[in-house]
């Protein structure tokens, strides 16, 4: 077994950590093993790892029997991985892709995503995950090691954590927080506590277009201190991308719901179910030659 500390030492011998990439490498074997374990039985399954860096998590994924698809943006780390995991690459147990995970095409079929992701790409990565789901299919499970504050917002840990990120994620995923990982478990140590999040896809209700809900939520939280009556006066920026929707229909629907009590609330006052119900009422307003 290739030990995590040795893998990190070998990569750092090639170059110092790139701060612009948010490189904090997990070296605690117990945490690495636990993260992989949260994904369940990975034998023969296609697993996407984003930002493998020195390969500490990659090693544990390979030991689980997974077929690993790893996307790494750092060219030096890619070369290190090619040399260190040459046999795994030759046997196609590891497929290594050099590029930015936010713009590089992911494999069409992914059974799981398991990653220690750079903190600065956490939010945009969730958007990419969502887009991949609608273009292809959702992975059975997503296990991410992220900054604890982000984990709380992602999983809606408390009502105070409600924001567009957590609400939109909850529309299509169940999410939970698992173990905390202290700074000392990384090299170099980050300044904050980290947390493991587990996401699993849930069935979407068919009575409302989830895209309408997402756009409405984003528009409302853009002015989170305003009541919905004010923040939703203007239609969402990308509303016209939704079939049957345009600015005139939006304004007509909002006018028809002028007495709706929800409009006197602020976005953080609404639960996920309340957002769905409100958007269902929006969509059900009769369209008359608009």
Predicted regions and their residues:
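Catalytic cores of RNA-modifying enzymes
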Residues: 1-219, 277-278, 283-290
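An accessory alpha-helical subdomain
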Residues: 192-195, 199-201, 206-255, 259-274, ...
């Amino acid at each position: 077994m290739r030990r995590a500390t040795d893998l990190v030492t070998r990569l750092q011998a090639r170059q110092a950590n790139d701060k612009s990439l948010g490189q904090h490498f997990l070296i605690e074997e117990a945490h690495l093993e636990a993260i992989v374990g949260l994904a369940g039985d990975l034998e023969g399954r296609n697993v996407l790892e984003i930002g493998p860096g020195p390969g500490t998590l990659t090693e544990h994924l390979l030991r689980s029997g997974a077929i690993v698809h790893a996307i790494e943006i750092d060219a030096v780390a890619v070369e290190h991985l090619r040399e260190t995991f040459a046999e795994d690459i030759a046997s196609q147990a590891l497929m290594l892709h050099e590029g930015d995970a936010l713009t590089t095409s992911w494999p069409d079929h992914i059974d799981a995503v398991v990653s220690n992701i750079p903190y600065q790409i956490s939010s945009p990565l969730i958007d990419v995950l969502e887009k991949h789901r609608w273009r292809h299919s959702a992975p059975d499970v997503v296990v991410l090691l992220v900054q604890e504050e982000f984990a709380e917002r992602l999983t809606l840990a408390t009502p105070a954590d409600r924001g567009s990120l957590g609400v939109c994620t909850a529309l299509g995923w169940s999410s939970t927080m698992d173990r905390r990982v202290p700074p000392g478990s990384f090299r170099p140590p980050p300044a904050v506590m980290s947390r493991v999040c587990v996401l699993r896809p849930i069935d979407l209700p068919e009575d409302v277009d989830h895209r309408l809900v997402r756009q409405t939520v984003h528009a409302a939280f853009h002015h989170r201190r305003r009541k919905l009556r004010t923040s939703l006066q203007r239609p969402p920026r990308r509303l016209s991308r939704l079939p049957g929707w345009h600015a005139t229909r939006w304004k007509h629907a909002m006018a028809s719901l002028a007495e709706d009590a929800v409009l006197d609330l602020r976005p953080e006052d609404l639960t996920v179910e309340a957002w769905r119900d409100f958007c269902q009422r929006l969509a059900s307003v009769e369209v008359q030659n608009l």
